[in-house]
Amino acid sequence: MSLKHTIKPIFYRVGLRLLPVALFQIQHWLMHRRFGTYSYWANLHNPETFNEKLLRSKLDGDHAELTHLVDKAAVKSWVSERIGEEHIIETIGVYDDPEQVPLNNLPRHCILKPTHASGHVIILRGTEGDPTPKEILKTMKCWQRINHYHLSGEPQYRDIAPRIICEPLLGDGASDLPDYKFFCFHGEPAYIQVDIDRHSRHVRRYYDCDWQPQDFTLRYPMARREAPRPERLDRMLDIAQMLSAGFNFVRVDLYESAEQVYFGELTFHPESGTAPFSDYQKDLMLGKLLELREEHSV
């Protein structure tokens, strides 16, 4: 396991127990110093920016009801009930123990990821560049020791049982399908994030719901080229609206294939509420869209 996944959880466990506000403020400041062109000390007692309000929301309320919505296996039934089973990516298998994963009998094109964490994935494309079964097993065993709460402070991840999920790789297997991340405030989509070259030179572009490009980005550089408008944008906006109903904020991630729109995941604290905007005023702008009020039960 990497140093990040050994030292950081210890630091977080102590900080979350003793000084959670200071912990989040320090993490926010460090992320801005590392990835941004400016930095500021997050005010969590009177939050105004988008990041400040996300950080504040990690401290308040009962997040236990969100646990099944960030579990990458459990969330599928909840989403299916709301938008239809046709939008759910097939599940090849869910495994409690990495040793249970049939590494020598997996489909040629598939992905493996932990159900209980964020930002971890193994992509198998059926090429010489794929990791070996031994390497895959080693990585999955590391995943099983992760408690994402102790890496991000997001309480909805604290009590998720560690498992591995296997899904087919959408598209032609050679390249990733475009994914669209809908920033939804109080049940209404407002902005759409498009990531380009995520596994190499990662850049981003943001659009409004009419697919007009915006003059800001979050953490990663702004893409120079514009992404084409998705054919099923209207359907994706409808889906994002349905899935975000009842929440102060949630990011709804969707994929578009040649045949269908597929659900990806729900994210309640993008970048854990610490990623710098390219412009501080945009952090304030999105913050004005987010009211921290009691959320509906799900």
Would you name each region that the model predicts?
Residues L54, E90-D97, H109, G119, ...:
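Catalytic phosphate/metal-binding cores of nucleic-acid and nucleotide-processing enzymes, i.e., regions
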Residues M1-D60:
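Membrane-proximal basic amphipathic "stem/tether" segments
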Residues T115, I122, E128, I192, ...:
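C-terminal and inter-domain tail/linker signature
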Residues L112, P178-D195, R204-Y206, Y262-T267:
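Beta-strand scaffold of nucleotide-dependent catalytic cores
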Residues D159-R163, Y206-V261:
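A long amphipathic alpha-helix within ATP-dependent nucleotide-binding catalytic cores
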Residues E256-V298:
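C-terminal active-site "lid" helix and adjoining low-complexity regulatory extension at the edge
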Residues D60-D62, L66-P178, H186:
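Active-site nucleotide/adenylate-binding loops and adjacent lid/helix of ATP-dependent enzymes
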Residues G126-T127, C184-E188, R198, S257-E259:
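Short acidic-glycine loop/turn motifs at beta-strand connectors
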